């Protein structure tokens, strides 16, 4: 423990190979959530198709989606001031780094596809099947990419100055989701190439657009016609006004932190597809920190540009269109309202592509463990050597979330309801890391998270889980219905998973006089799967 207390948060731990023992010395084989083989570097039927640059884009495109353009408006509306908004982004960045360190240690220790599914199964082998069931329920119920499909549709229609009906808005969002599912399901290499191109275009566009705002304000190429009013004594960055209007309600601060953490969601995206990554451990240790620094820099510059160019009240009332307001004020109605919103739509589309790519692999891993119906079909990579079954499992809930809820608060609600169960699993993974360190002190760890970062992550997860139930001063959250609805829905999903697990693995076997056993099978395409079969007692 003493060795780790002086290590920087994202520094790889040195490895003393001659001091290592059997990594499974302290854990009986019958108590492993995964077999020994399943914790070794795996190879997907698709092969090692992801290079370092592809892995970097997979992470950056997942992290930098619509959040940098869509969430600042709702965050400012919740917290009320420039200073508190930037403070929330800073705290969220630090917390994201803590979570990333935990994911990197797990990923280097268990370098195979599946992400949190693998880590929870390995860490919590008892009660049997519980961790796997909860991950499966979350993947099916909350494993969607609806939010960025919604942003894509909203910014595309805004760019063409169309006042859409609700049906048109939803149809465009569903069209994007469907097209991406078809590309990833039928054309593996083409899909990877497209998402790589979109990723680099996205980084260039976001950097250029954000830096343009600073350039216009700082160098005044158009004189005082743009942004001059921002340099009065009541300028948003003047110290006497920077905290004006701050709302320190922990309930609202927590929802804002959820949104910031959502904007950083996906820093561990490469953990979900390590079977397809070349040199997975080395790539993981360099790609993730590089993506974190990239996202942090772009987010900081973008937020400063908003506050310098767009009046605070307009930001608060902008909803998800604050990015469009920035570009409209800088470049006028034609360019600002057309080209730049289209660039934001491209950013959202790139995010949907990489999220779909990664979550399809997670769903396929869940199916291979026998925790989804029709597991043979969903586990197979035929006929296109792609996880088509996993894509279908991802497509259905995303389609329903886009199509069924009414417009209005749906974007904020989706962000919140996705974030809450994620904090529950993040807490379980972080506590589990400490348990594994104690249980297996001699296990090979190519990367080791800084222990204060691990404890900070635990404390913040607990605080964020409690915060939604603390009433805001006016008993109003960031939606027009009950402020804690998202926490109740998120908790209900987890409780439903526990109930389903109990009925499926405990109650029904007790009534039927059988027990569930794992049986290994190999599909025609060479994929190894686990079937859960009934065995009479």
Residue ranges of predicted features:
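C-terminal membrane-solvent junction of multi-pass transporters and transport-like membrane proteins
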Residues: 376-388, 426-491
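Transmembrane helix-boundary motif of multi-pass solute transporters/channels
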Residues: 42, 46-151, 261, 270, ...
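Helix-loop-helix junctions that connect adjacent transmembrane segments
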Residues: 9, 14-16, 20-21, 41-46, ...
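Membrane-interface "cap" regions at the ends of multi-pass membrane proteins
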Residues: 1-78, 96, 508-537
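Membrane-helix boundary/coupling elements in multi-pass transport proteins
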Residues: 112, 136-150, 259, 264-277, ...
């Amino acid at each position: 423990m003493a060795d780790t207390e002086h290590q920087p948060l994202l520094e790889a731990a040195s490895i003393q190979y001659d001091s290592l023992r059997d990594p499974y010395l302290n854990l009986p084989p019958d108590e492993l959530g995964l077999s020994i083989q399943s914790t070794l570097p795996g190879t997907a039927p698709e092969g090692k198709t992801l290079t370092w640059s592809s892995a970097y884009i997979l992470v950056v495109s997942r992290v930098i989606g619509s959040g940098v353009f869509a969430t600042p408006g709702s965050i400012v509306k919740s917290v009320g001031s420039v200073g508190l908004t930037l403070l929330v982004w800073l705290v969220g960045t630090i917390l994201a780094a803590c979570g990333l360190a935990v994911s990197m240690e797990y990923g280097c220790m268990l370098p195979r596809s599946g992400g949190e599914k693998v880590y929870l199964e390995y860490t919590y082998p008892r009660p049997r099947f519980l961790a796997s069931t909860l991950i499966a329920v979350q993947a099916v119920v909350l494993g969607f990419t609806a939010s960025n499909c919604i942003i894509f549709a909203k910014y595309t229609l805004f760019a063409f100055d169309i006042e859409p009906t609700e049906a048109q808005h939803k149809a465009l969002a569903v069209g994007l989701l469907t097209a991406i599912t078809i590309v990833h399901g039928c054309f593996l290499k083409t899909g990877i190439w497209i998402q790589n191109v979109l990723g680099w275009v996205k980084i260039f566009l976001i950097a250029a657009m954000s830096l343009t705002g600073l350039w216009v304000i700082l160098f005044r190429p158009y004189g005082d016609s743009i942004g001059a009013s921002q340099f009065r004594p009541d300028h948003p960055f003047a110290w006497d006004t920077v905290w004006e209007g701050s709302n320190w309600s922990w309930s609202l601060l927590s929802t804002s932190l959820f949104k910031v953490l959502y904007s950083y969601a996906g820093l561990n995206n490469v953990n979900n597809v390590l079977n397809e990554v070349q040199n997975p451990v080395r790539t993981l240790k360099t790609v993730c920190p590089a993506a974190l620094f990239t996202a942090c820099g772009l987010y900081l510059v973008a937020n400063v540009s908003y506050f310098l160019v767009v009046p605070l009240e307009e930001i608060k009332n902008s909803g998800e269109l604050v990015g469009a307001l920035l570009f409209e004020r800088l470049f006028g109605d034609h360019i600002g309202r057309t080209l730049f919103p289209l660039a934001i739509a491209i950013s959202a589309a790139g995010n949907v592509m990489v999220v779909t790519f990664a979550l399809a692999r997670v769903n396929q891993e869940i199916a291979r463990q026998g925790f989804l119906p029709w597991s043979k079909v969903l586990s197979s990579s035929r006929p296109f050597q792609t996880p088509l079954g996993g894509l279908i499992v991802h497509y259905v809930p995303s389609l329903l979330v886009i199509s069924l809820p009414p417009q209005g608060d749906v974007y904020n609600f989706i962000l919140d309801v996705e974030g809450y169960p994620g904090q529950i699993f993040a807490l379980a993974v972080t506590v589990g890391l400490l348990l594994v360190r104690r249980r297996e002190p001699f296990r090979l760890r190519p990367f080791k998270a800084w222990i204060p970062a691990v404890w900070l992550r635990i404390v913040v997860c607990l605080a964020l889980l409690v915060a939604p139930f603390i009433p805001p001063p006016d008993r109003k959250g960031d939606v027009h219905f009950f402020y804690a609805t998202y926490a109740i829905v998120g908790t209900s999903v987890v409780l439903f998973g526990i109930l389903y697990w109990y009925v499926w693995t405990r109650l029904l076997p007790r009534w039927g006089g059988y027990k569930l056993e794992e049986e290994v099978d190999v599909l025609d395409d060479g994929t190894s799967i686990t079937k859960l079969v009934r065995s009479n007692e």
